[in-house]
UniProtKB/Swiss-Prot annotation:
Origin superkingdom: Eukaryota
Cellular component GO terms held in the UniProt record: cytosol; intracellular membrane-bounded organelle; nucleoplasm; nucleus
Residue ranges of the region described as Disordered: 112-165
Stated role: Plays a role into cellular response to oxidative stress. Decreases cell proliferation.
GO MF annotation, one: RNA binding
PANTHER family in alphabetical order: RNA-BINDING PROTEIN EIF1AD-RELATED, TRANSLATION INITIATION FACTOR-RELATED
Protein name as catalogued: Probable RNA-binding protein EIF1AD
Length: 165
C-alpha cells in the first residue's frame, strides 16, 4: 500500500468512526510530547504516564497538547504504560458526552477546549443577496486574508506623485 493510500485510510478511520472505549481502554488527555512518538498523558484520576503512538498513525495524524485519546494498556511497560488506539476529535468528544462515557474530570476541560476553538475561528458576517443580483468581482471581503503577511497600504497622494515623476 502506498503512503498516500495509507494516509487516506487512516484519516478516514479517525474522522469517520465514533467508538466507545472498552473496559480495558481509558480516555486520557495529552499533556506534552517528549519525542520519539511518545506522549505524556493524564487520566481522569490524575495519573500521569507515557503512551506510544502506533506506526499507522505516525506522520499521518498529528497530536497536540490538550487533545484527548483512547489508549490500550500495556502490561509489561514500566515507563510507557499504554498505546494509542484512537485519537478523539471534537465530534467524538461530544458524542461520548451525550452517551455518558465521558469522564467527569474532563468535562470542564473539553468545554474550554471547544470554546477556545470557536473563539479562534473568525465568523464572517453573512451578506444578504437579492435573488437577481450576483456578487460583484470587485468585492473582496469574502476572500481569505493571510495574517502572516504585512499589509501595505498605498495612499492616493503617493501614487499621484509617482505618476507625475
Amino acid at each position: 500500500m502506498s503512503q498516500a493510500t495509507k494516509r487516506k485510510h487512516v484519516v478516514k478511520e479517525v474522522l469517520g468512526e465514533h467508538i466507545v472505549p472498552s473496559d480495558q481502554q481509558q480516555i486520557v488527555r495529552v499533556l506534552r510530547t517528549p519525542g520519539n512518538n511518545l506522549h505524556e498523558v493524564e487520566t481522569a484520576q490524575g495519573q500521569r504516564f507515557l503512551v506510544s503512538m502506533p506506526s499507522k498513525y505516525r506522520k499521518n495524524i498529528w497530536i497536540k497538547r490538550g487533545d484527548f485519546l483512547i489508549v490500550d494498556p500495556i502490561e509489561e511497560g514500566e515507563k510507557v504504560k499504554a498505546e494509542i488506539s484512537f485519537v478523539l476529535c471534537k465530534d467524538h468528544v461530544r458524542s461520548l458526552q451525550k452517551e455518558g462515557f465521558w469522564p467527569e474530570a474532563f468535562s470542564e476541560v473539553a468545554e474550554k477546549h471547544n470554546n477556545r476553538n470557536r473563539q479562534t475561528q473568525p465568523e464572517l458576517p453573512a451578506e444578504p443577496q437579492l435573488s437577481g443580483e450576483e456578487s460583484s468581482s470587485e468585492d473582496d471581503s469574502d476572500l481569505f486574508v493571510n495574517t502572516n503577511r504585512r499589509q501595505y497600504h498605498e495612499s492616493e497622494e503617493e501614487s499621484e506623485e509617482e505618476e507625475a515623476a
